[in-house]
Amino acid sequence: MKVTLPDFERAGVMVVGDVMLDRYWYGPTSRISPEAPVPVVKVETIEERPGGAANVAMNIASLGASSRLVGLTGIDDAARALSQSLAQVNVKCDFVSVPTHPTITKLRVLSRNQQLIRLDFEEGFDGVDPEPLHERINQALGQIGALVLSDYAKGALASVQQMIQLARKAGVPVLIDPKGTDFERYRGATLLTPNLSEFEAVAGKCKTEQDIVERGMKIIADFDLSALLVTRSEQGMTLLQPGKAPFHLPTQAQEVYDVTGAGDTVIGVLAATLASGNSLEEACFFANAAAGVVVGKLGTSTVSPVELENAVRGRAETGFGVMSEAALKEAVLAARKRGEKVVMTNGVFDILHAGHVSYLANARKLGDRLIVAVNSDASTRRLKGDTRPVNPQEQRMIVLAALEAVDWVVPFEEDTPQRLISEILPDLLVKGGDYKPEDIAGSKEVWANGGDVMVLNFEDGCSTTNIIKKIQKNS
């Protein structure tokens, strides 16, 4: 088994399926409405994230592969928001606009980390002419190494059989994350990736490993599949292929925070790895490692090449660098067992300059290990505006991890790192600038745990904003 990452940059993948926009409204609630016995939420933060097939496409793009997305949308603000969000992460969208239907949108209202209600805005696309989708697939088949069909039963894959046959005729593997119990719809696919409950809904309850193997092989034969991958949560995943022994991979998840979107990550990594020229067994190996990373994050997430490389090389256990939250907790625990003092700071670190380097070096001198928590791209946009960050999250983390002063780099999605700090609980929390210690996010949690909080001065004359202005002035 190879442990070097696939050459994702040479991979081209098309995703066809049910695209949707996930909207999140966050805010505090402190009273009950006088109109009805329901809480009143004062909305303070609004987030929009691509969902469904769009999340699969984002997972492929996050690896550095060429990612194309085809689906059905309305002609509305949600469709425009989807296109803009996906363009920012290098997903090439080729939507079919249907003027009679709205773009599928799911709105969630949350307060104090609890979802209060979900509102679905959708109208099934069943009955919509599938020919424009077929045309887009045909045009791309000579330029892609894999086709993913992402089925959420919203109508985009009503003609899934024709799509499978188009790809088979061109010799392009077809990977499908199935929906429902009618696997006949997917006859002739290269690979189906049901989770255990989806598998058992078709095959029946499995009491033993042998039951899974025997019933899985029957499904392969009955529906003319090339392979079947059963994802089994904490039990890992099992690949079944005709004429080959079952290939089982135990889970690599160190700690599970959220399984949202894990299936999208699995099929995205599978497709990108196959399109890179690797075997199906190798694709499962990398997909399993990626799943172990993504469930260690909160919310729907993607996996970067750096995170995937760390996972397959075991750097989370023995080394340093960019890490998931779950891996970082393990590394910090090991450091404390060695009697090391852990220092933590945070920031955007968009364009790294001398002031940053000096500040991080000074922070590192205050302890034995330095953690740098980095705002994700979405978090940075909310904090700094739509023109930021200049450098994407992965590049910012790679540069930080290369600094001698920095031991661990971890991203966070929220507006502040308060939740992350409360999970890590460093011995010393450091922030640069003119903050008061009590105003620093996470300070109360660190103090309550017996730690310290300190403010360090930034080097005069060094500012990312000033650098950007200077570049703009000279361009």
Swiss-Prot record:
Reaction catalysed by this enzyme: D-glycero-beta-D-manno-heptose 7-phosphate + ATP = D-glycero-beta-D-manno-heptose 1,7-bisphosphate + ADP + H(+); D-glycero-beta-D-manno-heptose 1-phosphate + ATP + H(+) = ADP-D-glycero-beta-D-manno-heptose + diphosphate
Pfam families: CTP_transf_like, PfkB
InterPro entries: Bifunc_HldE, Carboh/pur_kinase_PfkB_CS, Cyt_trans-like, PfkB_dom, RfaE_dom_I, RfaE_dom_II, Ribokinase-like, Rossmann-like_a/b/a_fold
Pathway assigned in UniProt: Nucleotide-sugar biosynthesis; ADP-L-glycero-beta-D-manno-heptose biosynthesis; ADP-L-glycero-beta-D-manno-heptose from D-glycero-beta-D-manno-heptose 7-phosphate: step 1/4; Nucleotide-sugar biosynthesis; ADP-L-glycero-beta-D-manno-heptose biosynthesis; ADP-L-glycero-beta-D-manno-heptose from D-glycero-beta-D-manno-heptose 7-phosphate: step 3/4
Active site: 264
Residues bound to ATP: 195-198
Region Ribokinase, annotated ranges: 1-318
Keyword ATP-binding: yes
Keyword terms, alphabetized: ATP-binding, Carbohydrate metabolism, Kinase, Multifunctional enzyme, Nucleotide-binding, Nucleotidyltransferase, Transferase
SS bonds (residue pairs): none
Entry EC number(s): 2.7.1.167, 2.7.7.70
Gene Ontology molecular functions: ATP binding; heptose 7-phosphate kinase activity; heptose-1-phosphate adenylyltransferase activity; phosphotransferase activity, alcohol group as acceptor
Region (Cytidylyltransferase): 344-475
GO biological process, one term: ADP-L-glycero-beta-D-manno-heptose biosynthetic process
A cellular component annotation (GO) from this entry: cytosol
Subunit composition and interactions: Homodimer.
Record-stated family: In the N-terminal section; belongs to the carbohydrate kinase PfkB family. In the C-terminal section; belongs to the cytidylyltransferase family.
Stated role: Catalyzes the ADP transfer from ATP to D-glycero-beta-D-manno-heptose 1-phosphate, yielding ADP-D-glycero-beta-D-manno-heptose.
PANTHER family xrefs: BIFUNCTIONAL PROTEIN HLDE
NCBIfam families (alphabetical): cyt_tran_rel, PRK11316.1, rfaE_dom_I, rfaE_dom_II
UniProt-recorded name of the protein: Bifunctional protein HldE
Source species taxonomy: Bacteria, Pseudomonadati, Pseudomonadota, Gammaproteobacteria, Enterobacterales
